[in-house]
Amino acid sequence: MKVTFEQLKAAFNRVLISRGVDSETADACAEMFARTTESGVYSHGVNRFPRFIQQLENGDIIPDAQPKRITSLGAIEQWDAQRSIGNLTAKKMMDRAIELAADHGIGLVALRNANHWMRGGSYGWQAAEKGYIGICWTNSIAVMPPWGAKECRIGTNPLIVAIPSTPITMVDMSMSMFSYGMLEVNRLAGRQLPVDGGFDDEGNLTKEPGVIEKNRRILPMGYWKGSGMSIVLDMIATLLSDGASVAEVTEDNSDEYGISQIFIAIEVDKLIDGPTRDAKLQRIMDYVTSAERADENQAIRLPGHEFTTLLAENRRNGITVDDSVWAKIQAL
């Protein structure tokens, strides 16, 4: 089915208000969920909203909490989210990293005791729109087996890198081949994954999203490489924030909350003039996209460039929402 941005935001806002969230916070949170969905990231927008409400009702998320600065070391700051709303707090932390970068050339904010930030790419994009390189990542509950294991002991720990090119170039990737949100999107659409994404009941690689969801044996991106990246990203976030690791979140908490996150902004214009920056970025993009195609019908893609097209299509034609997901939200 199709809905407008206004319908989507109103539905989110209604549910948040009914759960006791104050009107200003509810409006800002509903706006972010709707913007994420409108941009085409359904897995961490509309599809994720019922799960967000579940955690709100369980007390994992404290809607009136505000992040608190703990330590300031010039370009580096350490903050405590105090289990506040994840997407609103993440936006504030990237804004703070940008402010630090404006003064120092680079800004780093390490956040502990945080909640799920929903679409991580929103915060990299936020920096790139203002002309900064944006880098951020988060740890999570253990939802992926380390390479060579059967048990989940590492997080998908998504990493975002956004570059202020025209259009914005951005990688937004979990350390698994597919996030659990994308497994859900493909399952709801009745699609197999384009490549293997995890293991079946017999321990064989499979493209069936429902089987992978059931078994909780998701495949690390690049096999041992994604597994290793997940571990070191967790270590850095834990140390810089003085926060909880994947092990602590998984073993000590009843659900995924109290996680650790990193937000970095770099002011490129302190290092290179604007025309030179733009020319260098354009040459990279032209060089990549002018390569001979393996399939004449398949264009060579640059990461993140599809979001400009998806956003325009959703604004023109309405936002696609799965019927079953919409029914869940209407019933909340």
From Swiss-Prot:
<comment type="similarity">
    <text>Belongs to the LDH2/MDH2 oxidoreductase family. DlgD subfamily.</text>
</comment>
<dbReference type="GO" id="GO:0005737">
    <property type="term" value="C:cytoplasm"/>
</dbReference>
<dbReference type="GO" id="GO:0047559">
    <property type="term" value="F:3-dehydro-L-gulonate 2-dehydrogenase activity"/>
</dbReference>
<comment type="subunit">
    <text>Homodimer.</text>
</comment>
<keyword id="KW-0963">Cytoplasm</keyword>
<dbReference type="InterPro" id="IPR003767">
    <property type="entry name" value="Malate/L-lactate_DH-like"/>
</dbReference>
<keyword id="KW-0520">NAD</keyword>
<keyword id="KW-0560">Oxidoreductase</keyword>
<dbReference type="InterPro" id="IPR023689">
    <property type="entry name" value="Diketo_gul_Rdtase"/>
</dbReference>
<feature type="active site" description="Proton donor">
    <location>
        <position position="44"/>
    </location>
</feature>
<dbReference type="InterPro" id="IPR043143">
    <property type="entry name" value="Mal/L-sulf/L-lact_DH-like_NADP"/>
</dbReference>
<dbReference type="Pfam" id="PF02615">
    <property type="entry name" value="Ldh_2"/>
</dbReference>
<dbReference type="InterPro" id="IPR043144">
    <property type="entry name" value="Mal/L-sulf/L-lact_DH-like_ah"/>
</dbReference>
<protein>
    <recommendedName>
        <fullName>2,3-diketo-L-gulonate reductase</fullName>
        <ecNumber>1.1.1.130</ecNumber>
    </recommendedName>
</protein>
<feature type="binding site">
    <location>
        <begin position="304"/>
        <end position="306"/>
    </location>
    <ligand>
        <name>NAD(+)</name>
    </ligand>
</feature>
<comment type="function">
    <text>Catalyzes the reduction of 2,3-diketo-L-gulonate in the presence of NADH, to form 3-keto-L-gulonate.</text>
</comment>
<feature type="binding site">
    <location>
        <begin position="168"/>
        <end position="174"/>
    </location>
    <ligand>
        <name>NAD(+)</name>
    </ligand>
</feature>
<feature type="binding site">
    <location>
        <begin position="224"/>
        <end position="225"/>
    </location>
    <ligand>
        <name>NAD(+)</name>
    </ligand>
</feature>
<dbReference type="GO" id="GO:0070403">
    <property type="term" value="F:NAD+ binding"/>
</dbReference>
<dbReference type="InterPro" id="IPR036111">
    <property type="entry name" value="Mal/L-sulfo/L-lacto_DH-like_sf"/>
</dbReference>
